[in-house]
């Protein structure tokens, strides 16, 4: 007998129920993307390694899945090189292609290749799997979907406003209460400027983030332990203790950052986004949060992050503004802003809060039990008509034992079962069983349709 | 400057318009799958090579994309092995994983791994890309989507009937006239039996298929040239000349195959499928076609193939009944029947016949022109309301030149544009331009919504 098959570690099969839930998530997000004028693209799973390498740092390069060249992959490699066993160096000889690591680099590559046919500003979304040779662990997979929306070729803050509205609408549709956190890279730059410690900005945000947990004294001690001079720590006090409404925070920052051009610009941008969003009436809480420091190497303006309020889990969505998407491919000045929805975490959140609508599962609504050839022949035209009316329906294909057929209906959570034997055929009717209530009734085909569609 | 980036040969980017069309195709098929009780699964892109190797013949093994092991892939390979440069043999040392080559083997693997949680008969569909290191050529790609529906764990011919109904409904929805060809492996076995030439069945079907083109004499000559004795060719005459309605063909076959148990079984199965399908009223032409010989190594009963009637192109869908899906993984007796829709060819057919409905493109319905901050601020609440009403709408994010903004509307084929300047703001109205007719009218926000939604 063949060995029992398995799947590579860090990968997953998605069963029908999981798929239905995932489709509900992606379709909901997709509808919002369309509502805001975003258009879908897809890029190949495989990219040339020359496109991928060097874009994610040394660590990222190691995590790329590389595809062995077809045919004689030893071609062009000397014996000496082979015996050197230099896995990193020879990878580029054995392999010309790799699996995409994220959606951003392929998007940048796409924009450069298709620049002449794209009408900018280009609002694109992309929902595709990515692959990373990470050590698999709970909640971290080697293959997972990313779900990104970006608009490139526009510096307007209206794009940031729209993205906040989109986040608000997506989670509103899901019924998940979220807090949308906003920061701005320029504010962080301003803070670094006024205290003269540009390279300590991450240490500072990490320390400030602990204020609630460890208190002001300990925050200041941590800052000192990171080598930040007392004078700078003194200047940081109003920022560490920043509180109140977004408006109050912004007013404080205007004073503190008065001498930093970048800082004031960041405050102004944040003010516009927060005011406009608030005027347009989003339902989620939107909060200026200076401790938000995701993607600092990459983001140049607004930074977003979304936290679920009723589930303990990391951020379920995030993004920001960047200045130069395509510079690595020799095309400068392509700024943009984007967000990414974390499908796996959203899946977990909706599961924990039990928020999947029943319709989302898209399953069979009506099963015809099969008692034999004659009964099946009686059912088939009715089944065909029922489907014609848009009802998802099936007949159990074999005349198996009743128990097995009802078990099938239960497993597939089919809400209605039609049963046809001698009596029903003689009367031109069917017995319709409501699987939820257990109720049974003798109905005509038209009545059956009315009940099931109700 | 960095080199201009490209993509691996045989792969494709899908632009927004292509994506919208592809989504229309997949969503249409998906809806039909759901209507018939099929449920979606997804399997990982990467499978263990032990799962994939040996399933597609030697040629197929060569066409698998193999993924280089992470870390030190030289581990466990001796210097002698390296210097042997045996690319085929060492591939299994360098690589443990490969990209999926089709959806059937991963499905079989899935069924074996999840047998205890599946409620049989299991009606599953799967729409995912597959990868083959084929030589790229026109219409043949190294990455392409397959779209398969199978039901396993049931021998009932009602499954075959349903699949024909599904094919009929899918192409009916597309508006593509098709001919659904049906054959049965057992009929072909019967033919081989009565003439005593079991290994010549492919030669025979190929020769018969040429009847219309080259005439009976040449068909017989070709059969003789393939080493089929005259006596056998004589017996084949009624089969070569088989014509008339499906009923007439079946009657002839009953006589010709009278001494073959398998042959008669095949006739009986075909008769049931054709009669039942016809009684249920499919719209497509359904034809018994003995020259249909796809997947003869694999199919054991019914064989299907779908041809578009109004476009010159290969089959756009096909499938059949198989006896033992999971035997290669040590689980016997799992018979099933399935069909596969050829997405790329269907895409071409719908393009050639111009059959994409306008709604399929899902694009923006209304663009607000942006004349500046004040005008944008006036538009934003209206835009928000319009979206609230389900209209896909956007505002041009920058106050660019009118020409550029109108060009954007044209490129995205946006049917309505709202223009707001001083006058409109003073009157609390908007100028709405119908981009198809060129008509302009001054409307209130409510009137705008009514026109755009109409």
From Swiss-Prot, chains A, B:
EC nos: 6.1.1.21
Any one of the GO CC terms: cytoplasm
Predominant location: cytoplasm
Keyword ATP-binding carried by entry: yes
PROSITE patterns the UniProt entry points to: AA_TRNA_LIGASE_II (PS50862)
Subcellular localization(s) per the UniProt record: Cytoplasm
GO molecular function, one term: histidine-tRNA ligase activity
Oligomeric and partner information: Homodimer.
Name of this protein: Histidine--tRNA ligase
Organism, as annotated: Phocaeicola vulgatus (strain ATCC 8482 / DSM 1447 / JCM 5826 / CCUG 4940 / NBRC 14291 / NCTC 11154) (Bacteroides vulgatus)
Gene name in the database record: hisS
